[in-house]
Amino acid sequence: MTTTHDQTAAKIPKRVIWLAVAGAVGGFLFGFDSSVVNGAVDAIKDEFALSEAVTGFAVAVALLGCAAGAYLAGKIADRYGRIPAMKLGALLFLVSAIGTGFAFGVWDLIFWRLVGGLGIGLASVIAPAYISEISPRHVRGRLASLQQLAITTGIFAALLSDAVFATSAGGADQALWLGLEAWRWMFMAAAVPAVVYGWIAFTLPESPRFLVFQGKDEEALRVFKSIAPDEDSDRHLREIKKAIDEDKLAGQKGSLRGKALGLQPVVWIGIILSVLQQFVGINVIFYYSTTLWKAVGFQEKDSLTISVATAVTNILVTLVAIALVDRIGRRPIMLAGSIGMALSLGTMALAFGSATGSGDAISLPGAWGPAALVAANVFVISFGASWGPLVWVLLGEIFPSRIRARALGLAAAAQWIANFAITLSFPVMAAASLPLTYAMYALFAAASFFFVMFKVPETNGMSLEQAETLFVPKGSAKEAAKESAKESARA
């Protein structure tokens, strides 16, 4: 039987799809940048005669730039608009791609990586904010999930381009074109998506919700009608203006400050969601992937095949999330994902508890090798179909419009810092005890289940203004203002 919801959800305006895909290109830059360095890191280390510590910092410093860019993104987007923030992100990423390709020493390479990080941080915030603000409520989950799909596609594209350059030159450290080594071309290839993203930004309309906050109601109405002509644009405009009036009545301004340790409770919810997404260890789970695949017959030389297979898996499971998120909701998918991650990480902790040897010589006896391999892939599937895309969906819709960009920026900055902390701490923790490291990630996965269970309400099918009301504390000025507005309407 087809429900009314299904019938409505099937009608997605083509222009909305285009705008969401265009906005998600920032996620492609995010994924490309996070993966492109993998094919170049060994060549960079040899080129500049770097120590392990300096090499690690040169790779990870982009994450600090991302954190700074994400934090600044909210302020830039609220002051100048979502589209100018996109253009700035594209410009920074373009400059970084060219600068890194022509780096003459490790310190200017680090500088250009930092600049690129600023651009990626901007893009990581603006994409989910923009997509959520232009998407109809019945398909917002699917369209917002395009951010994660773009990230995984960017990772896949970077893996392929790295392989093409390295193979063509006979190695990442070998000269390819114009006397420049292949690793330099790997970074300069990022200029292509940066230019595309910048060009797209010049074709996109500004977020209608930002326009309303700027007092440009007529322009906002035109944007609403252009992106979804079958929707009730006047009603959307009234809902946004009503939310603004309620905020004014409650004396609330665009501040993140609150009584919960200095921040509003909803801001903490966004920060904790972001941190948990990283603290389950997704970015380091395949640190020993070669060992796992060797346990079932693969050779070390098959690492590219392994990486590509993982990237394709990420893309496919993200498509599953896109198909389900507006049908069954955010909470059920995230809760199921948390269970899958906790169980698979726990299995990996047990498997590595029986390991012999250390470092590259580590081995898993008997059935533990295949068990760990299966568990690692179950983890990737569980994460990719739930917490990977849906955290971005929630970050785009749980924050009130007056603070959305800044709150999303702070949450994304926390995510990048958590990513940096996990990336730097994993080698040290793994050397001390790999089983305990995976057990710690399993505990964070279990914690993610209870956090969603008790702190994250369902937002499926709601407008952004309706979703905002789910996070209003009882007895707050905002709630009082809403009740006052209702009484005035009755009178």
Tell me what each language-model feature is:
Residues 1-491:
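Transmembrane-helix signature of 12-pass secondary carriers
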